[in-house]
Amino acid sequence: MREYLDSKSQKKVALLEKIFYAENHTSTQEELLNDLNITYPTLISTIKTINFDIERFGYKAFSIVHSAPNLSYTLKISDNCSIQLIINAYIRESPKFQILETLLLASFPNLQALAKKVHVSYSGIKKEIKELNEELRERNLSISTGNQVEITGDEFSLRIFYAFLFLVAYSGDRWPFSFVRYDEITDLLESCPKEIYRANSIDKAMMIHYYVAMHLL
């Protein structure tokens, strides 16, 4: 789902991963400038923005710190935390994801109304929908812009697509559905006979929870 990221977020993620996968989560200033092909002012402003974003996302376990004597940057990260949490947060804020999430629950009379809802320009919304439709057609889905703007396709394909979309974007970090709690679905599933429901892994259990939530919408 990284293809959903806009260009600015892609550059932030590239910088984050460059530092994260370096030895001891530390990269020198020279490595970052050369490998990412950016200028020093861009490096400084991007790191400042990333740290602001991380705080805004609520992930206090992460931060990029600068070591002046060594001219290096280190990603401070708590144990058992994954950089994927930050990447997922950027994905959730991307125009493409915002469009898909918005169209799950509502249709719009025209593109202008949708563009206003997701805070994208009219030309931008047309571009994003065109690119999304290239992906959606492979799943027999599409965003229709005829009489109204809506996502169309058979119900089963829609539910599978959104269950997977939300599972990847939200993962185990948070639960995106306000109308039902995760533990309520757990109770429901545990009351089912083992012939119907048996989760052999955490990933499988989470996927089933998201799929059930989509059916309850």
For the regions a language model picked out, list residue spans one by one:
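A cross-family "folded-core" feature that marks the main globular domain of proteins
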Residues: 1-217
